[in-house]
Amino acid sequence: MTKKYNIAVIGATGNVGRETLNILAERNFPVNKIYAIASDNSIGREISYGEKILKISSLTNLNFDDIDIAFFCAGSEVSKEFVPKATASSCVVIDKSSLFRVDNQVPLIVPEVNLSTLTEFNTKNIIANPNCIVIPLAVALKPLDNEIKIKRVVISTYQSVSGAGKAGMDELYDQTKSKYVFGENDPKKFPKQITFNLFPHIGDLNKDGYTSEEAKIAFELNKIMGNHFKASVTSVRVPVFIGHSISVNIEFNDKMDANIAEEILQDADGIVTISNNNDLAYISPVEVVGEDAVYVSRIRNDVSKPNAINLWITCDNLRKGAALNSVQIAEELINNYL
């Protein structure tokens, strides 16, 4: 008989929390009891879990002794307060905030890339889920790096508003509607107007001119892939509801070209490649909504530098960029560790 587990999803009413519930149901995760947890103003509300309906309950009343795996999807402040309470019991935490990603005692996992480091989870009973840009980046870069070591990468990200939560999606919707009706926009969640606009500003601006998002991406990518190459990052918020895209230039230490890269990526887990065989041979964000794969297109040589290529990477940031990755981690936990 298959063992079943008690699961808690903290932040269940948010974008990532809802998607986590959806994916747990879709993938038939062996659940005994599942708890949908959210803020006090959501208590008693109903939320879907596959064909079932769950009632939202309170985090303060949750007994972590009854929970095997807790998915924290509610941001760093909630994680800071409640993850220690969870790990004081036998509960394993998969945290989707940035809080524990820099902790050397907490594994930062992308299953297709560095699953072997999951053995370190029981040091603190915490596993960190990476940034929603870092996950597809690592999935695409790792098979190439396995073949020929990467020397450096230059990354430009085009990040949808859902990466900023429900409030980000609401602001894009409200601003778009207001622009037509009233001809005005009042930014609240974002630093500038997001409708019909984009801006290279995600997170706080550091003294070196990079934003905190750009610094996170560079740090996390190197932690996951082994700290042997440099990454320069520019992060751009774009008026797209769901789906992150990445333009990346990769320089290698030895011979690499677009044809070799495409062959490598075609054989890699979790990737769908699109060949340059017509004018529409690329994937846009709207086409990946609801998809689990990381899509790689526009694979081409860098004509300005030998042993360098360019890629266009796109994925659903709420699925593989967040919820799916965490559920894949949980699947590995129950298959080999719990």
Swiss-Prot record:
CDD domains attached to this UniProt entry: ASADH_C_bac_euk_like (cd18131), VcASADH2_like_N (cd02316)
GO biological process: 'de novo' L-methionine biosynthetic process; diaminopimelate biosynthetic process; isoleucine biosynthetic process; lysine biosynthetic process via diaminopimelate; threonine biosynthetic process
Active site: 132 (acyl-thioester intermediate), 244 (proton acceptor)
EC number: 1.2.1.11
Recorded metabolic or biological pathway in which this protein acts: Amino-acid biosynthesis; L-lysine biosynthesis via DAP pathway; (S)-tetrahydrodipicolinate from L-aspartate: step 2/4; Amino-acid biosynthesis; L-methionine biosynthesis via de novo pathway; L-homoserine from L-aspartate: step 2/3; Amino-acid biosynthesis; L-threonine biosynthesis; L-threonine from L-aspartate: step 2/5
Binding annotation for phosphate: 101, 216
Catalytic activity field: L-aspartate 4-semialdehyde + phosphate + NADP(+) = 4-phospho-L-aspartate + NADPH + H(+)
Pfam (any one): Semialdhyde_dhC
Highest taxon listed in the record's lineage: Bacteria
InterPro entries given in the database record: Asp_semialdehyde_DH, Asp_semialdehyde_DH_beta, NAD(P)-bd_dom_sf, Semialdehyde_DH_NAD-bd, Semialdhyde_DH_dimer_dom
Residue sites binding substrate per the record: 159, 237
Residues at which NADP(+) binds: 13-16, 41-42, 162-163, 187, 317
Key words, A-Z: Amino-acid biosynthesis, Diaminopimelate biosynthesis, Lysine biosynthesis, Methionine biosynthesis, NADP, Oxidoreductase, Threonine biosynthesis
A single GO molecular function term of this UniProt record: NAD binding
Summary of the function given for this chain in its UniProt record: Catalyzes the NADPH-dependent formation of L-aspartate-semialdehyde (L-ASA) by the reductive dephosphorylation of L-aspartyl-4-phosphate.
PANTHER family registered for this protein in UniProt: ASPARTATE-SEMIALDEHYDE DEHYDROGENASE (PTHR46278:SF2), DEHYDROGENASE, PUTATIVE-RELATED (PTHR46278)
Family of this protein: Belongs to the aspartate-semialdehyde dehydrogenase family.
Subunit structure, interactors included: Homodimer.
Name of the molecule in the record: Aspartate-semialdehyde dehydrogenase
Record organism: Rickettsia felis (strain ATCC VR-1525 / URRWXCal2) (Rickettsia azadi)
